[in-house]
Design a protein with these regions (language model features):
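Anaerobic metallocofactor- and corrinoid-dependent redox/one-carbon enzyme cores
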Residues: 2-13, 18-19, 26-30, 43, ...
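Long, compositionally biased, glycine/small-hydrophobic-enriched stretches that function as flexible linkers
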Residues: 2-192, 196-205, 209, 229, ...
């Protein structure tokens, strides 16, 4: 009998599911606790829907509860039990009925229906992350909040294949609204990103590394470290922070440390500085750096110090600052490059920055200087086939642009591909949620050429790993974007008939070989 079951991430064991221990490091007891939490979130949503209640405190619990179960977020059984206790108290408050089945119902049933139910569930987990970040900055959307109740309740209801597909596409539209909300939260709070060059070398002296996605946490840390002789470096998907005016104004935000999340156990080894995890992706810390790791928000790992927020959302990062000063950092400047040896990265090409150059881009397309635009991005991971994305970008023709976002960009963002009429060929849009920016750019180009997105010389080549990538894909499909290339493998939770439906309806295509796919896209024989 399986000790656990989880198939929500791209690296799931054998391409079918983790049953003894998670490839991510999740242990069976943690998986069981997360399943029990998910079951109770569904019951809580059902009870509130029956009463017509959607109180803010319940909405926050539903959102954060889903976020906790996202891949590489929380491995702390004690923290998960404590959060589940809060759900139990709320279940009693809303007078929810006694459960009739064990949490394993989530993964049982007819294969295609389980596939579709899982797709919606994993999409909800991704949207929960975005809604959480927006709410932390004071931004909410009633349609998004309502859909957490609807989506969770729908998971426990019987639906035909057609009804599941309709629900999933409806979710995709709502998730796009959620990404728009987070874009609004980020740009109104921190300003519109501007193109910014970021150094990967590390200066001597005390420093702190910040990883994850939470810009509010980064701002609080920057305020608390100002004038204390402690530099701050971003890591992973915090790289786009350098483009936001209200963050880049801090002169001690000096650069970017390391590469993508899956290399952290090597990158952080013997690091003479503390690391703050604001969200995923957290891997089980190794002894060589475990005493310098801190978590906050929904992130957790047993034995790792956690920085809580007070009732006003304030966090005291004094322990990190003191440890940074005590460790002292490197004694000399350190030369560190990206995966391809480059030492400078460029970020900040979000919708406002790119659309400010729209006339130049349009003229370049009309003149033939730009013949194709690729969006190559998404999650990175340790799967051997992910070098596909490096090779694909290297092989793109000189008359093409490469838009990129999320941690998949680290496969190639230190490459110098040159420029077209002063426009860099690689344009880093931002974090995974900035897929909203990418769509806005595409819509603006489509409007300028009086055509649909699918008629543009534009191809999406996406990499996925966890559930935020799932919700983004569902939003793109809901918007009618077709012929997306997806890799390095298709999700294990998509059954063969469901894959066929997506291929037939949307032209979804698994990646094959970089040159083969590139030739097919550019219709080269």
């Amino acid at each position: 009998m399986a000790e656990m079951f989880c198939f929500q991430c791209q690296q799931t064991a054998g391409g079918s599911g983790c049953v003894r221990t998670g490839v991510c490091g999740k242990q069976p007891e943690t998986a069981q606790l997360q399943d029990a939490l998910l079951d109770k979130l569904v019951r809580l949503a059902q009870a509130c829907e029956r009463k017509g209640w959607r109180p803010d405190e319940v909405t926050e619990l539903l959102t954060d509860g889903l976020f906790i179960t996202l891949t590489n977020v929380n491995f702390d059984d004690g923290a998960i039990r404590a959060f589940t206790q809060r759900i139990d108290e709320m279940l009693a408050w809303v007078d929810a009925p006694t459960p009739e089945k064990d949490p394993g119902w989530l993964w049982r049933g007819e294969t295609d229906l389980v596939s579709l139910r899982s797709t919606l569930l994993f999409g909800l987990k991704g949207m929960a992350a975005y809604a959480h970040h927006a709410r932390e900055l004071g931004y909410t959307d009633s349609a998004v909040d309502t859909w957490f109740y609807k989506g969770l309740t729908s998971l426990a209801q019987p639906h035909s294949v057609e009804e599941w597909l309709e629900l999933i596409l409806e979710f995709g539209r709502v998730n796009f609204q959620c990404m728009a909300l987070l874009d609004q939260a980020h740009t109104e709070t921190f300003g519109h990103p501007v193109p910014t060059r970021v150094n990967t070398d590390i200066q001597k002296g005390p420093f702190i590394v910040v990883t994850g996605h939470d810009l509010k946490d980064l701002r609080q840390l920057l305020k608390q470290t100002a004038g204390k002789g402690v530099n701050v470096y971003t890591h992973g998907e915090m790289l786009p922070a350098h483009g936001y005016p209200e963050l880049k104004k801090y002169t001690h935000l000096v650069g970017h440390f390391g590469t993508a999340w899956q290399n952290q156990q090597t990158d952080f080894a013997d690091l003479p500085a503390p690391v703050l995890f604001t969200t995923n992706c957290l891997m089980p810390p190794r002894p060589s750096y475990a005493d310098r790791i801190y978590t906050t928000s929904v992130v957790g790992y047993e034995g790792i110090p956690h920085i809580p927020a007070d009732e006003n959302g304030h966090k005291d990062f004094t322990p990190l600052i003191q440890q940074a000063l005590s460790l002292g950092g490197y004694e000399t400047d350190q030369s560190r490059g990206g995966l391809n040896g480059g030492h400078m990265l460029t970020t900040g090409f979000a919708r406002n920055a790119v659309l400010s150059q729209a006339p130049a881009i349009l003229n370049a397309i009309k003149s033939g200087a730009i013949k194709h635009i690729f969006l190559v991005g998404g999650c990175d991971g340790a799967h051997p086939g992910r070098n596909y994305y490096t090779e694909f970008v290297k092989r793109t023709p000189m008359d093409s642009l490469v838009l990129t976002l999320a941690c998949g960009t680290f496969r190639f963002n230190d490459l110098d591909l040159g420029e077209i009429h002063g426009i860099p060929r690689i344009l880093d849009i931002g974090q995974c949620n900035d897929a909203y920016s990418a769509v806005q750019i595409a819509l603006a180009l489509a409007e300028a050429f009086d055509c649909s997105i699918n008629d543009l010389p534009l191809t999406l080549v996406l990499s996925w790993y966890e559930q935020k990538a799932v919700c983004i894909l569902l939003s793109l499909l809901a918007l009618g974007v077709k012929n997306i290339y997806l890799g390095p493998t298709l999700p294990a939770f998509l059954s063969e008939p469901v894959v066929k439906m997506l291929v037939d309806a949307f032209g979804l295509q698994p990646t094959t070989h970089p040159q083969q796919d590139l030739d097919a896209i550019l219709q080269r024989g």
